[in-house]
């Protein structure tokens, strides 16, 4: 079938508005343009954005001679409770906001202009534990075919064996006929189809797909007048007591959890933003992504195939127990089979997908009904695709608490949360007075007590009792924050495979060292790889000069828990995990904000450090500087302006901490092996006295219509960032469109759709969509600094 993108020609308005809708281009996040107020029922979960229902409209023109053709609309993601109307008739309803779905248009079309209307609901707050976005936030396309054709998702490709490489291609057609197939490096072949044709291909000296060598093949299938092109990778996944095997060799999954938003763009699923996210995560040492806590986009799978990134595609955040009052629970029982079917259809041909997850922190797994459901969902996925293992992220401690009446999640708590939000809204009550419940309460408690609270709690005997039956009903046991159980449970359950489905950053080194010894410890996913909107303050160490309050109230917008911040900048924690996971041996230096040494900050268990790679702390001479060095070494030495100021032996971690008086100049870290030979060196240089505004584009040229990321920084004359320089920056764009502007600060009162932003530790980010030619970005700051940058259009 032939796809036609339907990205332009749309309007959007609040449902019920009488004024004409505003023109929008898909993908579109309607929620990002809403005000953020203390009366928002989504509250801390959604970053205080208000929730509304939306109506999208466009015209669909069908010529008379094409009316008898097959017409199928595909929506890759509409949040949520989507209704599709054609010519005044309801053609489809899909409640889940994160799955792609299809609409057969045949019963509703007529020749000429057809009215396509899509309703997306998001006024039913709270309905999510994080920023969901709203509207048609992923692409839409119209699939058409004339006469007999290959069915949608009708080409399925699977690697059967590796030596030699044998690949199976199954093709489903709507009628009998001849199916023709070509694959790179092989002669063309054909078969007769009676509705399905099965090809078995042998590829001599096949180029295997791995994260290190993401080789892809192209498969072209033709039938009648229809043609389908699919890419695939030759790779095989196996799992057992030898661990997780990729192409017959043990492979340690070293992953990061991510949410679906794209930072300053909100939930907009732009292919360029997705490609950038994958690139940044890979550059910082991760080889896998957990799509938390919903099926990922097609764009993400395409990029993970291309760049070499493993994917654990996760279905949902809850089953039949509410986490928020208006979440998906009311639809779950009727829809989970269709949802999983569509997730597998989307994932099947992608070599990057190596795991399916049925859910996240579903305390239902502590109950008899939930244990049976675990098995049912695992078996259902095996029936759709038995080439990939199935897991589920279980918070071991939460399961135990729920079994003794202290559950983090319950229908009653979700209802109370919604009632409190509604009463607060009616009274105009400030957010600070709203009582934290559910996961927010436990996140706050963990923030005060530290990560040990969660990890030690998971060692209680009852945690084993309330998880073992569910773990027996999945291929790989998913442990959320259960690292202190690994050794014990691997010994007690000799057939169990364990995946750290959600972990703290400071456990990366311990995980890596244990995984090298224990094959049945198959992997780890840190929370979180990249910062995200909503679930505010959960991972933030913020100070009073950037955050007006520490209560998570309005103004707070992001979690602050990413190893990479909201603008895509790797933090000290990213440098630590690079070394801990042995992406390289370092050394790296990061420094906690010297101007805040000893100051109180907002609490969080999901933050290991707020250190950053900078030695430019203006007016902080002689203040104590807390310096961190990350290295795989026997010893590290710290040198300031040519003088050794500290030396430490590294034991049981790849992190050494030093406290030294701040002094401008050159700070160096030198790493040594066990024989005291130098094996690595890095340095940070203080910025000079001159301050200027500097604009840097991430790419030297950008294709027309694509995104260009431009970092705005206060620097010295040599381009060294000055983190304590702070101001407001106004941005204009010529030859393009400013589509996002902001900083990484988790507390931010500006809209990311504004043309002005405050800086955060000397930096901000502008996202520009290129026009037809070169694009010029002009920035001015407080009447004192200005700069401009022209990015050439790529031919």
Segments from the language model and where they lie:
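Accessory beta-strand-rich segments of carbohydrate-active enzymes
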Residues: 2-16, 30, 46, 51-151, ...
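Substrate-binding clefts and catalytic carboxylate motifs of secreted carbohydrate-active enzymes
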Residues: 4-5, 11-18, 78, 125, ...
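Active-site-adjacent substrate/metal-binding segments within catalytic domains
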Residues: 35-62, 66-75, 79-86, 92-95, ...
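Short glycine/proline/serine/threonine-rich loop/turn segments at secondary-structure transition edges
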Residues: 66-69, 109-113, 127, 203-216, ...
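Extended acidic/polar, glycine-enriched regions
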Residues: 110-111, 170-239, 657, 661-665, ...
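Beta-strand-rich binding/interaction modules
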Residues: 165-191, 197-199, 625-644, 666-671, ...
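Short flexible loop/turn segments that cap and initiate beta-strands
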Residues: 179, 212-216, 624-626, 632-634, ...
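Edge beta-strands of extracellular beta-sandwich domains
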Residues: 227-232, 676-688, 785-794
